[in-house]
Amino acid sequence: MVAELEFEKPLVELRRKIQELKEFMKTADVDLSSEIEKLEARLTKLENEVYANLTPWDRVQIARHPQRPTTLDYIERLFTNFFECHGDRCFGDDEAIVGGIADYDGLPVTVIGHQRGKDTKENLRRNFGMPHPEGYRKALRLMKQAEKFSRPIICFIDTKGAYPGKAAEERGQSEAIARNLFEMAGLTVPVVCIVIGEGGSGGALALGVGNHIHMLENSTYSVISPEGAAAILWKDASLAQRAAETMKITAHDLKTLGVIDEIIPEVKGGAHRNADEQAKEIDRVLRASLKQLLALDGEALVEQRYEKFKQMGQVSFLQETIRAR
Amino acid sequence: MWKDLFVKKKKYAAIPSEPLRPEVPEGVMTKCPQCKKIMYTKELVKNLRVCLSCGYHHPMPARERIESVLDEGSFREYDAGMTSVNPLGFPGYIEKLEADRRKSGLNEAVVTGEGTLEGHPLAIAVMDSSFRMGSMGSVVGEKIARAVERAHEQRMPFLIFTASGGARMQEGVLSLMQMAKTSAALKRFSNDGGLFISVMTHPTTGGVSASFASLGDYNFAEPGALIGFAGRRVIEQTVREELPEDFQTAEFLLKHGQLDAVIHRHELKEKLAVVLAIHAGGGESGWWRN
């Protein structure tokens, strides 16, 4: 059974009631089926209501759900013959990022993504999906390899952020992220980025300079975590809920701000309820994306990516407000 | 009376005075945050804001920086009228911008333009930490990207002085995207052989250090400048270990291979001129030509 979230409490109660009645019907000799039917109808209605009116903070909870499918879950479902490649050839292998080559229904691709764990043991191994510089350098190495062999690149974004640690600073966390932004901007193969969980700041963007950027409906993408924003802006981390709203971090917000291309719908209740179905939704968008991008040559791809990021942001001149370009 | 001599003097309640803000020197005197010596602001400014006693490099306003490195009267500003809007409708943001505009005399946290340095034409961007901590929002990103594009069009080197706390929270994810925008502009510039020199000054952290600041063909820094990705407190909280005294200073970065050189402010112009001259190439003798 998947862990329930705070806003799902009314649903949980109703579900339990239905379950109780069903159990009771088995033991006692009474017919409650019409009662149960009624309750089930109410449950469906309530579910629709709850999931249609998710607040940004609810979505943050879904994006952080421990059972939310990770990069490897989607790789397994979308590709065949995934062959994982390790190491940055400089320092080590960072397991907070996975990457390799794979077959996407006949199309050779390179797949890279942040990888978090679903339990403590796995999370320790994956450093909670928070990469060190060697992780980003591995990712870049694989992207350059993809470019050499003309393979499209697919990036799954799912991190709270780049790891804030002593060793990370010593080995140049800033430079590693900056280098990825710089080099990704020049890749002559299609790059499709999909935010599947949390997209945390520069650590997320370092895999995010794509021709197309898509987001799962309940994922988030932001310059800082709601807790971090609350601590900096209002000196109070407990105002995270308010920050989640103010900071505009949901897929719908980012679509409005002109940062992402498509919102990938999630299965009812969130991706963790059905990874197989969720993978199918991703598959649909990813195929369309690649089909469109594979029609462009290398130069056009670089140009399209450049223009995409150039128009992001809003500025004004004198009194007149216009988009950056 | 004798007795009066022994009566304790009346006590006065200590009313805390306004805390000293050494980062924003105002008025006649300035206190050095490092050696605590108090000196005439005028003399400090004349010394390029390098402490006369201990050599501490005080933050330098963008206009003074431009004056200190470019040839006199050569500077022409780009996009001076570009200002921020409030894309997220963030409460209080417009007022904060207004207040900083008045305080710093700047429209935004970066001044861009072109000029000459010892005769070498170049495009330049100078960040100023007195405007919203030099944080990068849409305007900072756009002005820098445009300056790079102009350098590219006119085949000039691009020089930047960074000073920034990172991305601007109040513009949310749009601030984050400026990291990609500026880096993309630099990539295109670089592919065409453009020369980019980055001089990191105190402080250069977060999204700025993790984008254009670290992408120079030459990465320089001023002595003692704080440079890093994550904040010291955040790191201390996550790793729970003692961090070295010089952690995230320019000297620390030099030791760990992240910088080409740490350069004293008094020698900056001269050293930059050397690099520019080598890139301009074509010495008088030409002995290598057949």
Swiss-Prot record, chain A:
Coiled coil: none annotated. Its main location: cytoplasm. GO terms for biological process: fatty acid biosynthetic process; malonyl-CoA biosynthetic process. The keyword Heme does not apply. Residues 35-292 form the CoA carboxyltransferase C-terminal domain. InterPro entries: Acetyl_CoA_COase_a_su, ClpP/crotonase-like_dom_sf, COA_CT_C. Its EC number is 2.1.3.15. Pathway: Lipid metabolism; malonyl-CoA biosynthesis; malonyl-CoA from acetyl-CoA: step 1/1. Component of the acetyl coenzyme A carboxylase (ACC) complex. First, biotin carboxylase catalyzes the carboxylation of biotin on its carrier protein (BCCP) and then the CO(2) group is transferred by the carboxyltransferase to acetyl-CoA to form malonyl-CoA. The keyword ATP-binding applies. It catalyses: N(6)-carboxybiotinyl-L-lysyl-[protein] + acetyl-CoA = N(6)-biotinyl-L-lysyl-[protein] + malonyl-CoA. Belongs to the AccA family. This is Acetyl-coenzyme A carboxylase carboxyl transferase subunit alpha. Keywords: ATP-binding, Cytoplasm, Fatty acid biosynthesis, Fatty acid metabolism, Lipid biosynthesis, Lipid metabolism, Nucleotide-binding, Transferase. GO terms for molecular function: acetyl-CoA carboxylase activity; ATP binding; carboxyl- or carbamoyltransferase activity. It is found in: Cytoplasm. GO terms for cellular component: acetyl-CoA carboxylase complex. Acetyl-CoA carboxylase is a heterohexamer composed of biotin carboxyl carrier protein (AccB), biotin carboxylase (AccC) and two subunits each of ACCase subunit alpha (AccA) and ACCase subunit beta (AccD).
UniProtKB/Swiss-Prot annotation, chain B:
Its EC number is 2.1.3.15. It catalyses: N(6)-carboxybiotinyl-L-lysyl-[protein] + acetyl-CoA = N(6)-biotinyl-L-lysyl-[protein] + malonyl-CoA. GO terms for molecular function: acetyl-CoA carboxylase activity; ATP binding; carboxyl- or carbamoyltransferase activity; zinc ion binding. Residues 28-290 form the CoA carboxyltransferase N-terminal domain. GO terms for biological process: fatty acid biosynthetic process; malonyl-CoA biosynthetic process. Pathway: Lipid metabolism; malonyl-CoA biosynthesis; malonyl-CoA from acetyl-CoA: step 1/1. A zinc finger (C4-type) spans 32-54. Keywords: ATP-binding, Cytoplasm, Fatty acid biosynthesis, Fatty acid metabolism, Lipid biosynthesis, Lipid metabolism, Metal-binding, Nucleotide-binding, Transferase, Zinc, Zinc-finger. Acetyl-CoA carboxylase is a heterohexamer composed of biotin carboxyl carrier protein (AccB), biotin carboxylase (AccC) and two subunits each of ACCase subunit alpha (AccA) and ACCase subunit beta (AccD). Component of the acetyl coenzyme A carboxylase (ACC) complex. Biotin carboxylase (BC) catalyzes the carboxylation of biotin on its carrier protein (BCCP) and then the CO(2) group is transferred by the transcarboxylase to acetyl-CoA to form malonyl-CoA. This is Acetyl-coenzyme A carboxylase carboxyl transferase subunit beta. It comes from Geobacillus thermodenitrificans (strain NG80-2). The gene is accD.
